[in-house]
C-alpha cells in the first residue's frame, strides 16, 4: 500500500540529544536507545470516516519522534498499518449502502491528503490488514498448533488466544482485571461471550458470517482476522521484535497494544523458546476533546482536518494548534485555540522574513532540548515565540545576519511547521 509524499527536511548544523519518552509499561520517562536505525510502529486508522483532530494529534506526536530521532543522527524505520477490514468499516458501509472496499479506499486516500497537508513524515512501510491476511492465517495456525489458541466450540469457527498461557500478560497496561474487562467491553472485545476459557481471551480469527467478506483461514475455516493479530503480524513482518517505540492513542493501551504484544511474543517464543519483548517502549498520545467529551467517531463530536482545510484554514495553523498542548495531556479543541495558532503562525512568518534577527543558536539548541525531553512541544513553541518577539522588536544593531533562516529551518525540521518566505 502506498503512503504519501515526504516533505523536504532542512539540514541543521550539529545534532540533537537523546530522545526521552514516557513509557506506559514502566510508568516513567525513559531514554530511547535505538541502534543505528530507530524502529517505530504506530497503529493506523480504520478507514470508515475522515481524519479527525484526535487522529491528527496522535500522528503529529509520533511525527515529532521521527523528526527528533533523525536530527539526532538516526535512520528511522517507521511502520504504520491500515485496519482496512474491521467491524466499524463493515457497519458504516452497510449503513450507507456502499461497498466496504470503496469506502476504505476513499477514506484512506483522504487520510493521505490530510497527512500530506500537515507535513507528517510518511511511514516506510504502510501496510493494510487485507494484504496481510495470508501471513495472519499462518500465525493463527502456529498458535493453534502450539496449543496457545483454541477454536470456540459453538460451530462458528472463531479462534481465541488462551491468555492463561501468556506469561507477563498485563505488563504493558498495568491494569487490574476489572479495568481490563471494562475496557474490553468498550473497545471491541467480547468478555461476556459464552464458551471462552477466559473472559479476556482475544479473538484471533472470526469465522465467516453471512454478508461479510472472508478469506481462506486456519484449519480450513473461512473468515477474517481479529484486530490485534493484524498489528502483531505486520510488525513482525516489517520491523521484528524489540523495536524502539510502539505508538498510538491512549485508548489503545488496552486491549489493543496489550494483546498485540501477547500475540507477537507468543509467536516469537515458538521459534526462540524464550519470551522476547515486543517493543522497548509503549508511548501513548492523549485525547482531544470537544464540548467536554473525547472526540470520537462513535460520539459523532468530530472536527475533521479535511473540513478545516476546505474552509481555508492553513494546515500549519492546525499543526501548531495541536502541538500547543503536550502530547500526553488531554486537551480541548476550541475556536480560540485555532485563532491563537493562526496569529502565532503569522507572527513567526513575519519574523523569519527579516534578513537579520535575534541570535539563532540558542533557539536551535533550546528546540532540540525541549523536544528531546518527552516531546515538550509547548516549551519549544514558547522559545520560538520569544525569539520572534525579540526579532520584531529589536533595533538593527541588536540583530544577527542569517538568524531568521536558521530558525526557519529549525522550526521546519523539528516542529514540522513550514514558514514561508525564508
UniProtKB/Swiss-Prot annotation:
Gene Ontology molecular function, alphabetical: ATP binding; cysteine-glucosaminylinositol ligase activity; cysteine-tRNA ligase activity; zinc ion binding
Function: Catalyzes the ATP-dependent condensation of GlcN-Ins and L-cysteine to form L-Cys-GlcN-Ins.
Membrane-spanning intervals of the chain: none
InterPro entries the UniProt entry points to: Cys-tRNA/MSH_ligase (IPR024909), Mycothiol_ligase_MshC (IPR017812), Rossmann-like_a/b/a_fold (IPR014729), tRNA-synt_1_cat_dom (IPR032678)
Gene Ontology process terms (BP): cysteinyl-tRNA aminoacylation; mycothiol biosynthetic process
PANTHER family: CYSTEINE--TRNA LIGASE, CYTOPLASMIC, CYSTEINYL-TRNA SYNTHETASE
Cofactor: Zn(2+)
EC number(s) reported in the record: 6.3.1.13
Gene3D superfamilies from the UniProt entry: Anticodon-binding domain of a subclass of class I aminoacyl-tRNA synthetases (1.20.120.640), HUPs (3.40.50.620)
Species of provenance: Geodermatophilus obscurus (strain ATCC 25078 / DSM 43160 / JCM 3152 / CCUG 61914 / KCC A-0152 / KCTC 9177 / NBRC 13315 / NRRL B-3577 / G-20)
Any one GO CC term of the record: cytosol
Sequence motif 'HIGH' region, residues: 45-55
Similarity section: Belongs to the class-I aminoacyl-tRNA synthetase family. MshC subfamily.
Annotated region (Disordered), positions in chain: 185-221
List of residues binding Zn(2+): 43, 231, 256
Protein name: L-cysteine:1D-myo-inositol 2-amino-2-deoxy-alpha-D-glucopyranoside ligase
Record motif 'KMSKS' region, residues: 294-298
Keywords noted in UniProt: ATP-binding, Ligase, Metal-binding, Nucleotide-binding, Zinc
Amino acid at each position: 500500500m502506498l503512503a504519501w509524499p515526504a516533505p523536504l527536511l532542512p539540514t541543521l548544523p550539529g545534532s540533537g540529544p537523546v530522545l526521552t519518552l514516557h513509557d506506559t509499561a514502566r510508568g516513567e520517562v525513559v531514554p530511547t536507545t535505538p541502534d543505528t536505525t530507530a524502529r517505530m510502529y504506530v497503529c493506523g486508522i480504520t478507514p470508515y470516516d475522515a481524519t479527525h483532530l484526535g487522529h491528527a494529534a496522535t500522528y503529529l506526536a509520533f511525527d515529532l519522534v521521527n523528526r527528533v530521532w533523525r536530527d539526532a543522527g538516526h535512520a528511522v524505520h517507521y511502520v504504520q498499518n491500515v485496519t482496512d477490514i474491521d467491524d466499524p468499516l463493515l457497519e458504516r458501509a452497510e449503513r450507507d449502502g456502499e461497498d466496504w472496499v470503496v469506502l476504505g479506499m476513499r477514506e484512506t486516500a483522504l487520510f493521505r491528503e490530510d497527512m500530506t497537508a500537515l507535513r507528517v513524515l510518511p511511514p516506510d512501510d504502510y501496510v493494510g490488514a487485507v494484504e496481510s491476511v495470508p501471513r495472519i492465517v499462518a500465525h493463527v495456525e502456529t498458535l493453534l498448533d502450539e496449543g496457545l489458541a483454541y477454536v470456540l466450540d459453538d460451530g462458528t469457527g472463531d479462534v481465541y488466544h488462551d491468555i492463561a498461557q501468556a506469561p507477563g500478560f498485563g505488563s504493558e497496561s498495568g491494569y487490574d482485571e476489572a479495568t481490563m474487562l471494562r475496557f474490553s467491553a468498550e473497545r471491541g472485545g467480547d468478555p461476556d461471550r459464552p464458551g471462552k476459557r477466559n473472559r479476556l481471551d482475544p479473538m484471533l480469527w472470526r469465522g465467516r458470517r453471512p454478508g461479510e467478506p472472508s478469506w481462506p483461514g486456519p484449519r480450513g475455516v473461512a473468515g477474517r482476522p481479529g484486530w490485534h493479530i493484524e498489528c502483531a503480524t505486520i510488525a513482525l513482518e516489517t520491523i521484528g521484535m524489540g523495536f524502539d517505540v510502539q505508538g498510538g492513542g491512549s485508548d489503545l493501551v488496552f486491549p489493543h497494544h496489550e494483546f498485540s504484544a501477547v500475540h507477537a511474543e507468543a509467536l516469537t517464543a515458538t521459534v526462540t523458546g524464550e519470551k522476547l519483548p515486543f517493543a522497548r517502549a509503549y508511548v501513548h498520545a492523549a485525547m482531544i476533546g470537544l464540548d467536554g467529551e473525547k472526540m470520537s467517531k462513535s460520539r459523532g463530536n468530530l472536527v475533521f482536518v479535511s473540513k478545516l482545510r476546505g474552509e481555508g484554514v492553513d494546515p500549519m495553523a492546525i499543526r501548531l494548534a495541536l502541538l500547543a498542548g503536550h502530547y500526553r495531556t488531554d486537551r480541548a479543541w476550541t475556536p480560540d485555540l485555532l485563532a491563537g495558532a493562526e496569529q502565532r503562525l503569522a507572527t513567526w512568518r513575519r519574523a523569519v522574513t527579516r534578513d537579520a534577527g535575534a541570535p539563532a543558536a540558542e533557539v536551535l539548541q533550546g528546540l532540540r532540548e525541549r523536544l528531546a525531553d518527552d516531546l515538550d512541544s509547548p516549551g519549544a513553541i514558547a522559545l520560538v515565540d520569544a525569539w520572534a518577539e525579540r526579532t520584531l522588536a529589536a533595533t538593527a544593531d541588536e540583530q544577527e545576519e542569517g538568524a531568521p533562516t536558521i530558525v526557519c529551518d529549525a522550526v521546519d525540521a523539528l516542529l514540522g511547521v513550514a514558514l514561508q518566505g525564508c
